[in-house]
Amino acid sequence: MSHVYAYGQQCPKAAGIIHLGATSCYVGDNTDIIVMRQGLELVRKKLIGVLAKLAKFAEEYKDMPCMAYTHCQPAQPTTVGKRATLWANELVMDLNEIDHRLATLQLRGVKGTTGTQASFMELFKGDADKIRAVDASIAKEMGFDPKAVVPVSGQTYSRKVDAFILNALAGIGQSCMKFATDLRLLANFKEMEEPFEKNQIGSSAMPYKRNPMRCERICALARYLMVDVLNPSFTTGTQWFERTLDDSANKRVAMAEGFLATDAILNIMLNVTDGLVVYPKVVRSRLMAELPFTVSY
């Protein structure tokens, strides 16, 4: 409001229309959509990087037989590379979801105080085509397709958009948690492990340990991310009529931390997938120990 007042002092004739029907949501909601699009693009780039590393690993170890597990019990042989494709496939599904969110993301545009565009109808003397032209112009200026503006809104864009986006991010968390959990189990079997730095020690009391701390951190952050989905879900369900302000504080925390958690997870994934360690002799030993039982039927 202080800015509007200051501009009005400098431009008295425009004081009555300089903020006509804009509301803080005109600035805030459109900005949020732009920022989330940029965030999704950054997530997409890192996700593709992780997939490239997993694809390389899968190709390298596609012919190395190992034991597959169902119910965490020895089942039938598979290969180390084939198992890696399970991890990669779920991340591809996440990439497709991110792409869908980017392709369908729309700006709020100019909708006025309650979504009726009444103030803009007044400004343009009832010329609806001019309002549509303003919406298209804003979308184009912000790097969106001129038609990528929500058709209807209240004071805010639908908070289902936030729920959709955070669900897509949580999907990445799910996939990364599955990968990290598998790797933690394989580290216990001593078949595979995450990279272990030159000067890294297991713990102050037990320096000989090889704790899978990166994968543990992935799981911890992923758990937070998956629970964070509840926030925009409840916000959407409790958005009274054209809007309530109790969405604001929650949204600012939930969406920002959801993106930050996803970014942190993918950073760790890039590190882990770049240096996966396989112990072929242990892999073969465990396979051979179980193989007689798998061919006995």
Please identify what each model-predicted range represents.
Residues 8, 48-51, 55, 92-95, ...:
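Structural signal for well-ordered, non-membrane alpha-helices
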Residues 1-118, 124-141, 202-203, 213-217, ...:
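A helix-coil-helix interface module used to build multimeric assemblies
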Residues 126-229:
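Acidic, glycine-rich loop-and-beta core segments that form the ion-binding/anion-interacting portion
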Residues 3, 39, 43-50, 80-87, ...:
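Amphipathic alpha-helix face/heptad-repeat signature
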Residues 190-191, 203-297:
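Glycine-rich cofactor/substrate-binding loops
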Residues 13-15, 22-23, 75, 105, ...:
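Residue-level signal for pocket-adjacent positions within structured domains
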Residues 29, 72, 156, 242-243:
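Short, charged/polar, low-complexity loop and linker segments
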Residues 60-63, 97-100, 104, 140, ...:
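Conserved helix-loop functional segments at active or binding sites
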